[in-house]
């Protein structure tokens, strides 16, 4: 469980960022911007959840092959899931505000890019 804790924290921070961004868009630009932003955030967050589940199922030196295999499967599944979710959003949601969708999508990805800078010190042990 301790090796999974940083991934869980990151997913939780991403979810909070998605919700705050979607609510901010809803208040400032209206409901279409709000749900478009929420969709964009979910398009980034759900595949990250899938990857975390797949990547951190195994631990220990004896499971090295399974760990590598699960990382590859998690990343492939993440890419496919992202493409499918984008396709569903653009095909099935009308009206959709694309700048809000892509903006919150990128903001959510940036949380994971910046996580080592923001949360790095909380993961180390003495």
Swiss-Prot record:
Look up and give the membrane topology term. Multi-pass membrane protein
Chief location of this protein? membrane
Q: Which residues cross the membrane?
A: 10-30, 32-52, 71-93, 98-120
GO CC aspect terms: plasma membrane; proton-transporting ATP synthase complex
The keyword Acetylation is assigned to this record: no
The answer to whether UniProt assigns keyword Transmembrane helix to this entry is: yes
Superkingdom of the source? Answer: Bacteria
Write out the GO biological process terms. proton transmembrane transport
Localization in the cell? Cell inner membrane
Keywords attached to this Swiss-Prot or TrEMBL record, sorted alphabetically, are:
Cell inner membrane, Cell membrane, CF(0), Hydrogen ion transport, Ion transport, Membrane, Transmembrane, Transmembrane helix, Transport
Family recorded in the similarity comment: Belongs to the bacterial AtpI family.
Please explain the role this protein plays, according to its UniProt record. A possible function for this protein is to guide the assembly of the membrane sector of the ATPase enzyme complex.
Q: What is this protein called?
A: ATP synthase protein I
What organism, scientifically named, is this protein from? Pseudomonas aeruginosa (strain ATCC 15692 / DSM 22644 / CIP 104116 / JCM 14847 / LMG 12228 / 1C / PRS 101 / PAO1)
What's the encoding gene here?
atpI
């Amino acid at each position: 469980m301790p090796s999974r804790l940083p991934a869980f924290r990151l997913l939780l921070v991403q979810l909070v960022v998605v919700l705050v961004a979607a609510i901010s868009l809803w208040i400032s630009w209206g409901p279409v911007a709000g749900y478009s932003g929420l969709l964009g955030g979910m398009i980034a967050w759900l595949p990250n959840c899938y990857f975390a589940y797949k990547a951190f199922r195994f631990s220990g030196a004896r499971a090295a092959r399974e760990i590598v295999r699960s990382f590859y499967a998690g990343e492939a599944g993440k890419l496919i899931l992202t493409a499918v979710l984008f396709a569903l959003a653009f095909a099935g949601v009308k009206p959709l505000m694309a700048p809000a969708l892509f903006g919150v999508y990128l903001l959510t990805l940036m949380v994971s890019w910046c996580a080592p800078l923001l949360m790095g010190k909380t993961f180390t042990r003495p």
